[in-house]
Curated annotation (Swiss-Prot):
UniProt name for this protein: Ribosome maturation factor RimM
Gene that encodes the chain: rimM
UniProt subcellular location: Cytoplasm
Domain comment in the entry: The PRC barrel domain binds ribosomal protein uS19.
Protein family (similarity comment): Belongs to the RimM family.
Keyword flag rRNA processing: yes
Record-linked Pfam families: PRC_RimM (PF24986), RimM (PF01782)
Assembly behavior: Binds ribosomal protein uS19.
An example Gene Ontology CC term for this record: ribosome
Record-annotated PRC barrel domain positions: 97-170
GO molecular function: ribosome binding
Functional note: An accessory protein needed during the final step in the assembly of 30S ribosomal subunit, possibly for assembly of the head region. Essential for efficient processing of 16S rRNA. May be needed both before and after RbfA during the maturation of 16S rRNA. It has affinity for free ribosomal 30S subunits but not for 70S ribosomes.
Assigned keywords, A-Z: Chaperone, Cytoplasm, Ribosome biogenesis, rRNA processing
Length: 170
C-alpha cells in the first residue's frame, strides 16, 4: 500500500448550526456520519492554519451533520471556520475489506491493459451511482468503469499497477 501516513480529506465546515457553537459539516465518508469515527482530526483553515482536534462529537440531524468542537462556543467562531477542511491520517482508517479499496490508495497507480499496453496513471475516481469510475491520465484521459472483474482485472499495490480489460483506442 502507498504512504499510509498521508492525510485524507474527509469533509469540511459549511457553516453554523444555531447560536451555541454547533457546526454544520459536509462529509465525504460512507455513510456520512462515519466521519466521527476517525480521529484525531487535522483541520486546515482557508488561510492554511492547521490544528489537531480530538474529542469531536457529532450527530446526523437529517439534513446536515452537526458537530461540536472542543472550545467552540458561539456562532461567530463557527462562521470564521467556514471552509475549514477536515483531514485524518490514512492510518486512522480501518483496513479495507478484500477486493475493496480506498480511492486515495488507487490514485497514482499505473494502469495497463491485459495486453500490457500502458494507459497512464489513476488520476482520481468518482461515483455515478451505478458504479465508480476510474479516471486514467496518460496520452489522453480515459474514464473506465471500476467494475471487477468485468473491466478491472487486478489491483497490485506491490507492483503499483491496475490491470484493465479495455481497448486502448477507446
Amino acid at each position: 500500500m502507498k504512504d499510509i501516513e498521508r492525510r485524507i480529506l474527509l469533509g469540511r465546515v459549511v457553516g453554523a448550526f444555531g447560536v451555541r457553537g454547533e457546526i454544520k459539516l459536509e462529509s465525504w465518508t460512507e455513510p456520512r456520519s462515519a466521519i466521527f469515527r476517525y480521529q484525531p482530526w487535522i483541520v486546515r483553515s482557508p488561510s492554511g492554519v492547521e490544528t489537531t482536534i480530538e474529542g469531536v462529537r457529532g450527530r446526523d440531524s437529517g439534513k446536515h451533520l452537526v458537530a461540536r468542537f472542543p472550545g467552540v462556543e458561539d456562532r461567530d467562531t463557527v462562521e470564521a471556520m467556514r471552509g475549514t477542511e477536515i483531514y485524518v491520517a490514512r492510518s486512522a482508517l480501518p483496513p479495507p475489506k478484500p477486493d475493496e479499496y480506498y480511492w486515495v490508495d488507487l490514485e497514482g497507480l499505473d494502469v495497463k491493459t491485459t495486453e500490457g499496453v500502458a494507459l497512464g496513471q489513476v488520476s482520481h475516481l468518482f461515483s455515478t451511482g451505478a458504479n465508480d469510475v476510474v479516471v486514467v491520465r496518460g496520452d489522453r484521459e480515459r474514464m473506465i468503469p471500476f467494475v471487477q472483474p468485468d473491466f478491472v482485472k487486478s489491483v497490485d499495490f506491490e507492483a503499483n499497477l491496475v490491470v484493465v480489460d479495455w481497448d486502448p483506442e477507446f
